């Protein structure tokens, strides 16, 4: 079987390639060239491509480069900026996995004669049959600290059926040990912690460089709608933020809502950060073909958080037909839920599906 492995230049993808070689697959390495050449705005990718080439040489496999810069710019970077314009806080990695890393990448791999693709993601794929329907299920990785299934919840059945995650049963420590034993140059390379195209995790720098004219100063308001100050622009704030507000209220205040239509930022007390429910759109269901009635789930609205108990309710239109949107009702109010982020639904360590948080019903906000 011919497998095209995405080599990012990091240790995880390098070990994924090595494991597949050891298992007898016909492996080729590819690096997705994603970042446009705009000096001073985006991160540089040159070193990553060079490191990936060195890894491929060490493993004795061919290395190629897929130039995806144009599509990445329109589908991910432009999306990222537009979401901020709309007052939301996007998760570009969530969209990128669906459209680029397992979308465009898979399409090109199949055109080039490969049977499957593989990456260094920490997650598991399980083939099974549910109610007479063959399904490819997505599960959390063994290493809970490194599990990345949250970012993969938009993957379709076709994408899952054509993908391999060799690291699903490995800890990060074991991966580094394998890389060291194999003499790979990136065995101790630090993990990437931020969005791939954002230097130093400085979102506003990228947004201001690409769309500074789209943002204006506006009003800070309290949860009753009273003006209490002036903000610098919506791009500087995110739900739950406390620092940098420059508001003296006599008690700590946090960003609890952003409204692009009125160009206002609502601030409130800690208890006003909590949400009763959310509406998720662009929902993808993995566990079964459809969900047509309310079910009990666990949900994550941020990557680094514990799963929380909730009800998942499919929404229907006036003709009682599915809208593709779902309501999530938290059993206990959830803190700092942000529009634009990913909501991912779980049962045990299986991913039911996920979508984009479209709206949030917060406690005590007009």
Swiss-Prot record:
Active-site residues, record numbering mapped to chain: 96, 196
Lineage: superkingdom: Bacteria
CDD domains: MnmA_TRMU-like
Alphabetized UniProt keyword annotations: ATP-binding, Cytoplasm, Disulfide bond, Nucleotide-binding, RNA-binding, Transferase, tRNA processing, tRNA-binding
EC class (word): transferase
Record EC number: 2.8.1.13
Subcellular location: Cytoplasm
Signal peptide (UniProt feature, chain positions): none
Entry GO CC: cytoplasm
Known function: Catalyzes the 2-thiolation of uridine at the wobble position (U34) of tRNA, leading to the formation of s(2)U34.
PANTHER family: MITOCHONDRIAL TRNA-SPECIFIC 2-THIOURIDYLASE 1, TRNA 5-METHYLAMINOMETHYL-2-THIOURIDYLATE -METHYLTRANSFERASE
HAMAP family: tRNA_thiouridyl_MnmA
The protein's name in its UniProt record: tRNA-specific 2-thiouridylase MnmA
Organism of provenance: Treponema denticola (strain ATCC 35405 / DSM 14222 / CIP 103919 / JCM 8153 / KCTC 15104)
């Amino acid at each position: 079987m011919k497998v095209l492995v995405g080599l990012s230049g990091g240790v995880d993808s390098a070990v994924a390639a090595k494991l597949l070689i050891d298992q007898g697959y016909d492996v080729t390495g590819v690096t997705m060239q994603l970042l446009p050449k705009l000096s001073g705005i985006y991160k540089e990718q040159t070193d990553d491509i060079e490191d990936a080439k060195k890894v491929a040489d060490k493993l004795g496999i061919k290395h190629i480069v897929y130039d995806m810069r144009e599509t990445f710019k329109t589908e991910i970077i432009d999306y990222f900026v537009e979401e901020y314009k709309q007052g939301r806080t996007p998760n570009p990695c969530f969209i990128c996995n669906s459209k680029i890393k397992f979308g465009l990448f898979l399409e090109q791999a199949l055109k080039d004669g490969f049977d499957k693709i593989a990456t260094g993601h920490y997650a598991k794929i399980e083939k099974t049959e549910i109610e007479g329907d063959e399904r490819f299920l997505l599960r959390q990785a063994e290493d809970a600290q490194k599990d990345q299934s949250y970012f993969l919840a938009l993957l379709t059945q076709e994408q899952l059926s054509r993908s391999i995650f060799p690291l699903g049963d490995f800890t990060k420590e074991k991966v580094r040990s394998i890389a060291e034993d194999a003499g790979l140059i990136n065995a101790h390379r630090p993990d990437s912690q931020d969005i791939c195209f954002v230097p130093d995790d400085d979102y506003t720098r990228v947004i201001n460089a690409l769309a500074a004219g789209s943002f204006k100063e506006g009003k800070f308001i309290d949860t009753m709608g009273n003006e209490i100050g002036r903000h610098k622009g919506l791009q500087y704030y995110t739900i739950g933020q406390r620092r940098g507000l420059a508001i003296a209220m006599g008690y700590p205040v946090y960003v609890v809502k952003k409204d692009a239509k009125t160009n206002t930022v609502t601030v409130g007390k800690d208890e006003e950060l909590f949400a009763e429910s959310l509406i998720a759109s662009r929902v993808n269901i993995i566990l079964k073909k459809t969900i047509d009635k309310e079910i009990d789930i666990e949900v994550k609205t941020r990557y680094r958080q514990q799963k929380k108990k909730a009800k998942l309710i499919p929404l229907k239109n006036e003709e009682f037909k599915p809208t593709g949107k779902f309501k999530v009702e938290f059993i206990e109010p959830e803190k700092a839920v942000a529009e634009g982020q990913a909501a991912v639904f779980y049962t045990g360590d299986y991913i039911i599906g996920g979508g984009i948080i479209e709206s949030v019903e917060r406690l005590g906000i007009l």
